[in-house]
Amino acid sequence: MSRYRGPRFKKIRRLGALPGLTNKKPRAGNDLRNQLRSGKKSQYRIRLEEKQKLRFHYGLTERQLLKYVRIAGKAKGSTGQVLLQLLEMRLDNILFRLGMASTIPAARQLVNHRHILVNGRIVDIPSYRCKPRDIITGKDEQKSRALIQKSLDSSPQEELPSHLTLHPFQYKGLVNQIIDSKWVGLKINELLVVEYYSRQT
């Protein structure tokens, strides 16, 4: 299954706010209307919708998300927590959380077009897994800096997660540590996602 490229508002109307996909928010009352229209949800549908929220927020294909679930399942600790850590430490998501890109698709474009350096080297793989002490910078070119500046100017002035530090005038971000679960950028029940995949195998 390919990455979703359809109408974004349609997805947030059904699944709720997906800040990584779009900075638009569903209108108040939409959730209630959807529940009334669809009646009582089955457990399968609840798990499916949590999985879809995760997939669309982080901009993943079905195959990519399944791969992350399998990696998380083999790691020490809670599979759900490890899964969220893996997704949050992707380069495209780090750029989004720093405010250097307005959405995760926009961050992916920055990376694909070689505007981003990690530790002084161009990285053009959006799924690159960032590590503590990584230094992320915009390329020292006018176009790269202009794209990042536009996002910095328009990004909401929210508290930065504790695992990141931003130096906006240097177009630079630092990864201080692995993300703490309380700073995950999406309201999600990750256990339902793990359950969804465990029942598919």
UniProtKB/Swiss-Prot annotation:
Transmembrane segments: none annotated. The keyword rRNA-binding applies. Residues 89-149 form the S4 RNA-binding domain. Pfam families: Ribosomal_S4, S4. GO terms for molecular function: rRNA binding; structural constituent of ribosome. Keywords: Chloroplast, Plastid, Ribonucleoprotein, Ribosomal protein, RNA-binding, rRNA-binding. The keyword Chloroplast applies. CDD domains: S4. One of its GO terms (biological process) is ribosomal small subunit biogenesis. GO terms for cellular component: chloroplast; small ribosomal subunit. PROSITE patterns: RIBOSOMAL_S4, S4. It is found in: Plastid, Chloroplast. Belongs to the universal ribosomal protein uS4 family. One of the primary rRNA binding proteins, it binds directly to 16S rRNA where it nucleates assembly of the body of the 30S subunit. With S5 and S12 plays an important role in translational accuracy. Part of the 30S ribosomal subunit. Contacts protein S5. The interaction surface between S4 and S5 is involved in control of translational fidelity. This is Small ribosomal subunit protein uS4c. It comes from Coffea arabica (Arabian coffee). The gene is rps4.
